[in-house]
Amino acid sequence: MLLPRRCWGPWLAGRRPRCSCQSPAGFSGKDRRSSRVREKPPWRVLFFGTDHFAREALRALHAARDNKEEKLIEKLEVVTVPSISPKGLPVKQYAIQSQLPVYEWPDMGSGEYDVGVVASFGRLLSEALILKFPYGILNVHPSCLPRWRGPAPIIHTVLHGDTVTGVTIMQVRPKRFDVGPILKQETVAVPPKSTSKELEAVLSKLGANMLISVLKNLPESLNNGRPQPAEGVTYAPKVSAGTSCVKWEEQTSEQVLRLHLAIGDIVPLQTLWMENTVKLLDLVEVNNSILADPKVMGQTVTPGSVVYHRPSQMLLVHCKDGWIGVRSIMHKKTLTATDFYNGYLHAWYQKNSHAYPSQCKFQTLRLPTKTQQKTKLLLCSALSS
């Protein structure tokens, strides 16, 4: 007979494993040890999650519960976190629509479960909580750990131009995020020019399928878990509002485009135009034919310089090393590049007829610390909406 606790690794070293014939204590704090620990499916699962990535894993668990022939999941309940959105986070929405029992952290009901599953939950789980599950808690993480530990792995994958990523199913350990043994890991190529949301859709389906595969052979998967490599550890911290402020003097055109792909769907990139905040909505790479245009090549420019390129109907903005194209912006209202030229750039040139073109420029926006902290909360909410 497999002892679930034996699979938990060195963090329980020196402790005697609990008898495998006992089920975990209930979440009400009462001792609920009347039933034996199951050696095989169907499992009783408590799911912890928040966002769209987590919702796909929950959807797969729900489908498995409803599949009476396969008998993989017998019981499925959900824990999520409070949200500033009246309708709640995607996981809560799905749970309610699917008539699954749902609790708001730290409430977890009082049921008995065999295994916990975490995806995009954002809360450290205590050792006492983990020990309530005979088979521990599994984490579905959208990166190839140990690369991109932390709350924003998909954003950092895109931001840093990774060409390969993946999903890791690992065991949760207390006190630290994303450090437990790897049970299953699969890689996938990052589609060129994909946004974080597009990549999330790919990884969420992969992760959901991997989770079901692990649950089908749970005791064996736990016994075969391997420690994460000590090399190649990187971290993916939360993104703040300040990240969206383009630093024209410091960032290359490739870095600005990656930043747009990474967070543009969530919070648009920001800059200053004549002391007014402007949001850059649609950014594109500038092709060689535009760069070869004498009207572009002949300009004396500095980082932030703005030129309207009539043939492509784009604003060209100079970064640290070259140009990036902007097709639309938000300046009081949404404007195409042509609208912005007609309403603002052309007027600037008329008013400053003797100025150098390099003086017509966007400037780096510096957000106050309080604004960054406030917007960080809103951004975290947007990431899960």
From Swiss-Prot:
GO terms for cellular component: mitochondrion. It is an enzyme of class 2 (transferase). It is found in: Mitochondrion. GO terms for molecular function: methionyl-tRNA formyltransferase activity. Keywords: Mitochondrion, Protein biosynthesis, Transferase, Transit peptide. Its EC number is 2.1.2.9. Methionyl-tRNA formyltransferase that formylates methionyl-tRNA in mitochondria and is crucial for translation initiation. Belongs to the Fmt family. Composed of an N- and a C-terminal domain. The N-terminal domain carries the tetrahydrofolate (THF)-binding site and the C-terminal domain is presumably involved in positioning the Met-tRNA substrate for the formylation reaction. This is Methionyl-tRNA formyltransferase, mitochondrial. It comes from Rattus norvegicus. The lineage of its organism: Eukaryota, Metazoa, Chordata, Craniata, Vertebrata.
